[in-house]
Amino acid sequence: MNLIKMSDIDLSGKRVLIREDLNVPIKDGMITSDQRLQAALPTIKSALDSGAAVIVLSHLGRPEEGKYEKKFSLEPVADYLRENLEYPVRFVKDYLTGVDVNPGELVVCENVRFNPGEKGNDEALAKKLASLCDVFVMDAFGTAHRAQASTYGVAQYAPVAVAGPLLIRELEALNQVLKAPKKPIVAIVGGAKVSSKLSLLKQLVGMVDVLIPGGGIANTFLKAQGFEIGISLYEPDLLDEARHILILAKEKGCQIPLPTDVVVGKTFSETCPAFNKSLSNVAADDMILDIGPETIRDYVDLIHEANTIIWNGPVGVFEFPQFAYGTRAIAIAIAESDAFSIAGGGDTLAAVDLYDLNQQISYISTGGGAFLECLEGKTLPAVAILQERAKHVKTN
């Protein structure tokens, strides 16, 4: 990768602006999952240890741009960093006209999405952000697919723009999957909609040996094959696309196993009774909410044969315990495998967290959309600008 790394630059005494992905779930002012914060801490600590004056930017949630909303404030994140770093930490709401920060001090800036022009990569905003620093560090893989003021624009105008350690690790892990994967390769792609992962599915059939669809995606494939799926979630306008993917997979030598048995309910509810049924017995008023025990065994066997595993999305409604067996079994099979495994996407990370398997997956990506776009073979805008800037950076 033609990138200048943060570790290549002497940061001592310099103002270092780090774009992190600190977009964590917060309920009643409390952080409910700190995965992304734990992933970002080493980069922030490394810059502070180097004697830099550090400023951190991030978004949180999806506020109306330009409007302050307390529930989307990064203040709880600043509190978390204060508790987990042995350095002074300040939280600053107004920072576009300048930030006073000393070497060995961290300033956490308020949600970048409160700034008008953030999503549209406004040039004036990008220049204001760039003026805050001597060195800009892009470390937020999770937002690298977005050309926004705090990810792309600032990298254009900062005196120096480099890649952070977390971003480098993410790209290297994906590179291992995309450039020189050990076969056989098994991909598990779950979630509600084929439409959101259509490009990914088409890309994967030409790349992997086995593609296991889950959730609403699997339902669309089943319906396309003529199976009764009752009132299950599926996309009627994508049945032809699903058939095309099945044909394409056959041409490419990619196996797409579909469920032979499922777990159904009558309503989408945590209290809804669950029933195991063979696919041929699904009734017109059934809702498929998980894979059945026979399918679980088949999928686990396929995972155990893999040397490379890609996981994006649950295979059932794992938020409801009675429909979580499939996702749990898949997660444990991946964790127990000796294969190189990479997992990404919000629901996937939530499942990994729920089953306490963080240490048993080879690499857990902090990205959702960026993870998918990398797997689709797309160039991430925020990485592209770093590569362009790298041509002109002098390391010292």
From Swiss-Prot:
It catalyses: (2R)-3-phosphoglycerate + ATP = (2R)-3-phospho-glyceroyl phosphate + ADP. Its main location: cytoplasm. GO terms for cellular component: cytosol. Keywords: ATP-binding, Cytoplasm, Glycolysis, Kinase, Nucleotide-binding, Transferase. Its EC number is 2.7.2.3. It is an enzyme of class 2 (transferase). It holds the Pfam family PGK. One of its GO terms (biological process) is gluconeogenesis. One of its GO terms (molecular function) is ATP binding. ATP binds at K197, E319, G345, G346, D347, T348. Coiled coil: none annotated. It is found in: Cytoplasm. SUPFAM superfamilies: Phosphoglycerate kinase. HAMAP family: Phosphoglyc_kinase (MF_00145). Monomer. Belongs to the phosphoglycerate kinase family. This is Phosphoglycerate kinase. It comes from Legionella pneumophila (strain Corby).
